[in-house]
């Protein structure tokens, strides 16, 4: 039997929405898959540093980060596709002028403007009641924009208070950037939030690159996701699996819909396809 390649979105897929924990059944499923010779990758909108938040639990060797703009394996960065510094400044200045929140994401750290920093600070006590605000920001490698000193950036996240303001922003996004609406931490914002990467950078692109690197066929790839930034990877892999808690669009595009992320969705899907 050919080796299988497993790609997992994080927030809303591997990490149950609302609980911010990885289920024991998911940890067990990953262990069994590894024992069977499967190659597992996180495939996330998070930066590399933030993607490692749960690495002690899951020990996955591969990480596709920043929605496909970077690939790492066994602790080594294999490639990144950076947004030019001039474009980063132009976009963040525009978001600020329109009253929006943003965070710019590099390999190791995330830098946020004050509005975005407050938005996360307000949600952390609910999501992580046992940790202080400082501990959570450190855990997620998040810093204020004042601490940014020109590091390479792979992704820009943005959000606005209204769709009208967002539309003004969309009209001024250059063709050199790829845009994905409402994924990951922004999945509940509709058209008011999204993510920007270098043109052509998507999770689907990165899945294809990983398969090329390993000399593998897309038929042997299984991709798990729950929101719009997962759409491209579900389309390029042999089997696209949507979580039961996923958006209607992602479920319609999937080959299979499993249980919710917090109801053993990953474990049950891997069982269904006889991977474990």
Predicted regions and their residues:
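Conserved acidic, metal-coordinating active-site core of Asp-based
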Residues: 109-224, 228
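Asp-based phosphoryl-transfer active-site loop
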Residues: 4-19
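Short hydrophobic/aromatic-enriched beta-strand-loop microsegments
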Residues: 60-67, 179-180, 240-244, 258-259
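Active-site phosphate-binding/coordination module
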Residues: 21, 26-126
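Hydrophobic packing residues within well-ordered alpha-helices of enzyme cores
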Residues: 51-55, 169, 250, 266
